[in-house]
Amino acid sequence: MSQNTLKVHDLNEDAEFDENGVEVFDEKALVEQEPSDNDLAEEELLSQGATQRVLDATQLYLGEIGYSPLLTAEEEVYFARRALRGDVASRRRMIESNLRLVVKIARRYGNRGLALLDLIEEGNLGLIRAVEKFDPERGFRFSTYATWWIRQTIERAIMNQTRTIRLPIHIVKELNVYLRTARELSHKLDHEPSAEEIAEQLDKPVDDVSRMLRLNERITSVDTPLGGDSEKALLDILADEKENGPEDTTQDDDMKQSIVKWLFELNAKQREVLARRFGLLGYEAATLEDVGREIGLTRERVRQIQVEGLRRLREILQTQGLNIEALFRE
């Protein structure tokens, strides 16, 4: 997929913010998205008669919350009023009766970089906040009001925890415009839209769209497990660009053999100095001082012999169309 093709992530797309970057509660939006009792009933994760619990932590949690009955509209008003007056038991009842709503909403945010249990945990924080702020006299059902808070906490967690670099609120708002448009186009075009298609839809410069889309890219750790039955991490399958392949190794061996052959076209002193200086013919690479100490010559004399040897070797290589600088660094 090209760099200008978008993976659609609709994080926090409908949120409004004040000048301090705090979400503003939108009552009009809630009227449009209020879930019905039938929807909640259809989305119940476990039946009341389910008794078998599996070892999986998620299923265990879902099993536990399945025993909390939903509240009627009258019960919501009753417990909400008492919770506002500081009644702890009523507050707990409001929370426990709506935990399944959190799971229902959290499941919509799968494959966004956070595990389901993490999404549920964040959503529960939003639920608690909703219980603390809910005013039953406003005329909304609690599920409507709580949905807004649950979404905000989940979306904020995804935005903050799945990004290596946090984005400013105003950038997130602008990015969400592109993401919402991209999602709409993906349904209309039946494929993930390119930056050019998004730019045309929004009447924006393509460069601006491409820049914003790059902000939505995820950074993946090389230690990330591949998943499935494999125990390998991403690092285990990445190619090492610095490591020579078999064909490079063969070429290196051929080059070494050629260098040895060319060295033996020099006189004995030049051959020994170059071999010691550059780690050839079984020698370890050494400094001018070390070479002089080993063969009983001064540093300056070793340097002169090296220059003479390289000059002669350059002449030999030039006759074969080769460059000595590719072999040695003076």
UniProtKB/Swiss-Prot annotation:
Q: Looking at the record, which segments are called Sigma-70 factor domain-3?
A: 174-249
Q: Domain comment? A: The sigma-70 factor domain-2 mediates sequence-specific interaction with the -10 element in promoter DNA, and plays an important role in melting the double-stranded DNA and the formation of the transcription bubble. The sigma-70 factor domain-2 mediates interaction with the RNA polymerase subunits RpoB and RpoC. The sigma-70 factor domain-4 contains a helix-turn-helix (H-T-H) motif that mediates interaction with the -35 element in promoter DNA. The domain also mediates interaction with the RNA polymerase subunit RpoA.
**Keyword Cytoplasm annotated:** yes
KO phenotype (gene knockout): Stationary phase cells lose resistance to killing by endoribonuclease MazF.
Q: Which residues bind DNA?
A: 288-307
Gene Ontology terms, MF aspect? bacterial-type RNA polymerase core enzyme binding; DNA binding; sigma factor activity
**Does Chloroplast count among this protein's keywords?**
no
Renumbered to this chain, region (Sigma-70 factor domain-1) spans: 56-89
Q: Which GO terms describe its cellular component?
A: cytoplasm; cytosolic DNA-directed RNA polymerase complex; sigma factor antagonist complex
Region entry Sigma-70 factor domain-4: which residue ranges? Answer: 262-315
Q: Which family does it belong to?
A: Belongs to the sigma-70 factor family. RpoS subfamily.
Q: What is this protein called?
A: RNA polymerase sigma factor RpoS
- How the protein is affected by changing K173E? Eliminates RpoS proteolysis. Lack of interaction with RssB
SUPFAM superfamilies associated with the record: Sigma2 domain of RNA polymerase sigma factors (SSF88946), Sigma3 and sigma4 domains of RNA polymerase sigma factors (SSF88659)
- Which GO terms are recorded in the biological process aspect for this UniProt protein? DNA-templated transcription initiation; negative regulation of DNA-templated transcription; regulation of DNA-templated transcription initiation; response to stress
Sequence motif: Interaction with polymerase core subunit RpoC, positions:
118-121
**Species this chain originates from:** Escherichia coli (strain K12)
Task: Identify the PANTHER family for this entry.
Answer: RNA POLYMERASE SIGMA FACTOR RPO (PTHR30603), RNA POLYMERASE SIGMA FACTOR RPOS (PTHR30603:SF67)
**What does it do?**
Sigma factors are initiation factors that promote the attachment of RNA polymerase to specific initiation sites and are then released. This sigma factor is the master transcriptional regulator of the stationary phase and the general stress response. Controls, positively or negatively, the expression of several hundred genes, which are mainly involved in metabolism, transport, regulation and stress management. Protects stationary phase cells from killing induced by endoribonuclease MazF.
One Pfam annotation reads Sigma70_r4
Subunit structure, as described in the record: Interacts with the RNA polymerase core enzyme and RssB.
Q: What keywords does the record list, in alphabetical order? A: Cytoplasm, DNA-binding, Sigma factor, Stress response, Transcription, Transcription regulation
